[in-house]
Protein backbone atom coordinates (compact mmCIF):
# COMPACT_ATOMS: atom_id res chain seq x y z
CA UNK A 1 0.00 0.00 0.00
CA UNK A 2 2.95 2.30 0.64
CA UNK A 3 4.01 1.96 -3.03
CA UNK A 4 0.63 2.90 -4.49
CA UNK A 5 0.98 6.68 -4.13
CA UNK A 6 4.01 8.69 -3.11
CA UNK A 7 3.99 10.25 0.36
CA UNK A 8 2.77 13.68 -0.76
CA UNK A 9 -0.03 12.19 -2.86
CA UNK A 10 -1.19 9.89 -0.06
CA UNK A 11 -1.21 12.76 2.45
CA UNK A 12 -3.11 14.97 -0.02
CA UNK A 13 -5.68 12.22 -0.68
CA UNK A 14 -6.25 11.65 3.03
CA UNK A 15 -6.73 15.41 3.54
CA UNK A 16 -9.20 15.57 0.66
CA UNK A 17 -11.09 12.58 2.09
CA UNK A 18 -11.17 14.24 5.51
CA UNK A 19 -9.53 11.25 7.18
CA UNK A 20 -6.66 10.95 9.63
CA UNK A 21 -3.46 9.80 7.98
CA UNK A 22 -3.39 6.79 10.30
CA UNK A 23 -6.42 5.45 8.38
CA UNK A 24 -4.32 5.04 5.21
CA UNK A 25 -4.78 1.45 4.06
CA UNK A 26 -8.25 1.02 5.56
CA UNK A 27 -9.83 0.63 2.12
CA UNK A 28 -13.47 0.27 3.25
CA UNK A 29 -13.22 3.46 5.32
CA UNK A 30 -11.47 5.32 2.48
CA UNK A 31 -14.16 4.21 0.01
CA UNK A 32 -16.93 5.43 2.30
CA UNK A 33 -15.21 8.81 2.77
CA UNK A 34 -14.61 9.07 -0.99
CA UNK A 35 -18.30 8.58 -1.81
CA UNK A 36 -19.26 11.15 0.83
CA UNK A 37 -16.75 13.72 -0.47
CA UNK A 38 -17.90 13.13 -4.08
CA UNK A 39 -21.29 14.50 -3.08
CA UNK A 40 -19.69 17.41 -1.23
CA UNK A 41 -17.20 18.42 -3.97
CA UNK A 42 -19.45 17.77 -6.99
CA UNK A 43 -19.69 20.95 -9.12
CA UNK A 44 -23.41 20.44 -9.77
CA UNK A 45 -23.97 20.54 -6.01
CA UNK A 46 -22.00 23.78 -5.61
CA UNK A 47 -18.74 22.06 -4.68
CA UNK A 48 -15.15 22.80 -5.64
CA UNK A 49 -14.48 21.40 -9.13
CA UNK A 50 -10.69 21.46 -8.74
CA UNK A 51 -10.81 19.50 -5.47
CA UNK A 52 -13.20 17.01 -7.08
CA UNK A 53 -10.87 16.46 -10.04
CA UNK A 54 -7.79 16.10 -7.85
CA UNK A 55 -9.53 13.72 -5.43
CA UNK A 56 -10.81 11.61 -8.35
CA UNK A 57 -7.34 11.46 -9.90
CA UNK A 58 -5.63 10.39 -6.68
CA UNK A 59 -8.36 7.96 -5.62
CA UNK A 60 -8.58 6.27 -9.03
CA UNK A 61 -4.78 5.98 -9.18
CA UNK A 62 -4.73 4.41 -5.70
CA UNK A 63 -7.64 2.11 -6.55
CA UNK A 64 -6.07 0.96 -9.83
CA UNK A 65 -2.65 0.35 -8.30
CA UNK A 66 -4.18 -1.68 -5.45
CA UNK A 67 -5.99 -3.84 -8.03
CA UNK A 68 -2.76 -4.35 -9.97
CA UNK A 69 -0.93 -5.26 -6.75
CA UNK A 70 -3.52 -7.94 -6.08
CA UNK A 71 -3.25 -9.58 -9.51
CA UNK A 72 -3.56 -12.23 -10.71
CA UNK A 73 -7.25 -12.66 -10.19
CA UNK A 74 -7.84 -16.34 -9.51
CA UNK A 75 -11.39 -16.25 -10.77
CA UNK A 76 -14.55 -16.84 -8.88
CA UNK A 77 -15.21 -18.91 -5.81
CA UNK A 78 -18.27 -20.31 -4.15
CA UNK A 79 -19.25 -20.49 -0.52
CA UNK A 80 -18.82 -24.27 -0.30
CA UNK A 81 -15.09 -23.86 -1.03
CA UNK A 82 -14.69 -21.34 1.77
CA UNK A 83 -16.71 -23.39 4.24
CA UNK A 84 -14.47 -26.38 3.60
CA UNK A 85 -11.40 -24.38 4.66
CA UNK A 86 -12.81 -22.49 7.63
CA UNK A 87 -15.09 -23.32 10.55
CA UNK A 88 -18.70 -22.21 10.32
CA UNK A 89 -18.82 -20.28 13.60
CA UNK A 90 -18.02 -16.59 12.91
CA UNK A 91 -16.47 -16.21 16.37
CA UNK A 92 -13.79 -18.80 15.57
CA UNK A 93 -13.42 -17.91 11.89
CA UNK A 94 -11.05 -15.04 12.65
CA UNK A 95 -9.46 -16.19 15.91
CA UNK A 96 -10.14 -19.61 17.36
CA UNK A 97 -8.47 -19.20 20.77
CA UNK A 98 -7.32 -15.84 22.09
CA UNK A 99 -4.51 -15.37 23.26
CA UNK A 100 -3.05 -18.72 22.12
CA UNK A 101 -3.44 -17.92 18.41
CA UNK A 102 -2.02 -14.43 18.95
CA UNK A 103 1.21 -15.77 20.45
CA UNK A 104 2.13 -18.55 18.04
CA UNK A 105 0.28 -19.58 14.88
CA UNK A 106 -0.49 -23.26 14.54
CA UNK A 107 -0.56 -25.17 11.27
CA UNK A 108 -3.43 -27.20 12.73
CA UNK A 109 -5.58 -24.16 13.57
CA UNK A 110 -8.07 -23.19 10.83
CA UNK A 111 -8.63 -19.59 12.03
CA UNK A 112 -7.68 -16.68 9.77
CA UNK A 113 -5.33 -15.22 12.38
CA UNK A 114 -3.14 -18.35 12.30
CA UNK A 115 -3.50 -18.96 8.56
CA UNK A 116 -2.56 -15.38 7.61
CA UNK A 117 0.39 -15.34 10.02
CA UNK A 118 1.68 -18.64 8.60
CA UNK A 119 1.21 -17.27 5.08
CA UNK A 120 3.23 -14.20 6.13
CA UNK A 121 6.10 -16.39 7.35
CA UNK A 122 6.14 -18.35 4.08
CA UNK A 123 5.96 -15.27 1.86
CA UNK A 124 8.60 -13.42 3.88
CA UNK A 125 11.27 -15.85 2.67
CA UNK A 126 10.25 -15.46 -0.97
CA UNK A 127 10.59 -11.66 -1.11
CA UNK A 128 13.45 -9.21 -0.81
CA UNK A 129 11.28 -6.36 0.46
CA UNK A 130 9.52 -6.65 3.81
CA UNK A 131 5.81 -7.41 3.77
CA UNK A 132 3.52 -4.54 4.75
CA UNK A 133 -0.19 -4.04 5.35
CA UNK A 134 -2.32 -4.59 2.20
CA UNK A 135 0.54 -6.68 0.76
CA UNK A 136 -0.10 -8.97 3.70
CA UNK A 137 -3.27 -8.98 5.82
CA UNK A 138 -1.85 -10.75 8.88
CA UNK A 139 -2.39 -9.15 12.27
CA UNK A 140 1.35 -8.51 12.69
CA UNK A 141 1.46 -6.34 9.55
CA UNK A 142 -1.75 -4.62 10.75
CA UNK A 143 -0.34 -3.76 14.18
CA UNK A 144 2.98 -2.65 12.73
CA UNK A 145 1.37 -0.47 10.03
CA UNK A 146 -1.01 1.28 12.43
CA UNK A 147 1.39 1.32 15.40
CA UNK A 148 -0.91 -0.69 17.68
CA UNK A 149 -0.26 -3.16 20.47
CA UNK A 150 -1.57 -6.69 20.07
CA UNK A 151 -4.70 -6.60 22.26
CA UNK A 152 -8.24 -7.94 22.00
CA UNK A 153 -9.40 -4.47 20.93
CA UNK A 154 -6.82 -4.46 18.13
CA UNK A 155 -8.05 -7.92 17.15
CA UNK A 156 -11.60 -6.57 16.86
CA UNK A 157 -10.46 -3.72 14.57
CA UNK A 158 -8.50 -6.21 12.45
CA UNK A 159 -11.51 -8.58 12.27
CA UNK A 160 -13.73 -5.72 11.10
CA UNK A 161 -11.36 -4.85 8.24
CA UNK A 162 -10.70 -8.49 7.28
CA UNK A 163 -14.45 -9.12 7.27
CA UNK A 164 -14.93 -6.42 4.61
CA UNK A 165 -11.94 -7.48 2.50
CA UNK A 166 -12.59 -9.68 -0.56
CA UNK A 167 -11.42 -13.23 0.14
CA UNK A 168 -9.15 -13.41 -2.92
CA UNK A 169 -7.24 -10.34 -1.69
CA UNK A 170 -6.25 -12.18 1.49
CA UNK A 171 -4.04 -14.47 -0.66
CA UNK A 172 -4.80 -17.58 1.37
Swiss-Prot record:
Pfam families: Papo_T_antigen. Coiled coil: none annotated. The modification N-acetylmethionine is found at residue 1. The keyword Zinc-finger applies. InterPro entries: DnaJ_domain, J_dom_sf, Papo_T_antigen, Papo_T_antigensf. It is found in: Host cytoplasm; Host nucleus. A zinc finger (C4-type) spans 101-114. Residues 12-75 form the J domain. CDD domains: DnaJ. SUPFAM superfamilies: Chaperone J-domain, T-antigen specific domain-like. Signal peptide: none annotated. Keywords: Acetylation, Activator, Early protein, Host cytoplasm, Host nucleus, Host-virus interaction, Metal-binding, Oncogene, Phosphoprotein, Transcription, Transcription regulation, Zinc, Zinc-finger. Its main location: host cell. Promotes efficient viral genome replication by accelerating both G1 and S phase progression of the cell cycle. Inhibits host PP2A by binding to the A subunit, thereby displacing lower affinity regulatory B subunit. Inactivation of PP2A in turn results in the transactivation of cyclin A and cyclin D1 promoters. Late during the infection cycle, ST may induce dephosphorylation of host MTOR, leading to the inhibition of cap-dependent translation. May establish and maintain high levels of viral genomes during persistent infection in cell culture. The common region of ST and LT proteins comprises the J domain. This domain is essential for multiple viral activities, including virion assembly, viral DNA replication, transformation and transcriptional activation. This domain is also required for cyclin A-transactivating activity of ST. Interacts with host PPP2R1A; the interaction inhibits PP2A activity. This is Small t antigen.
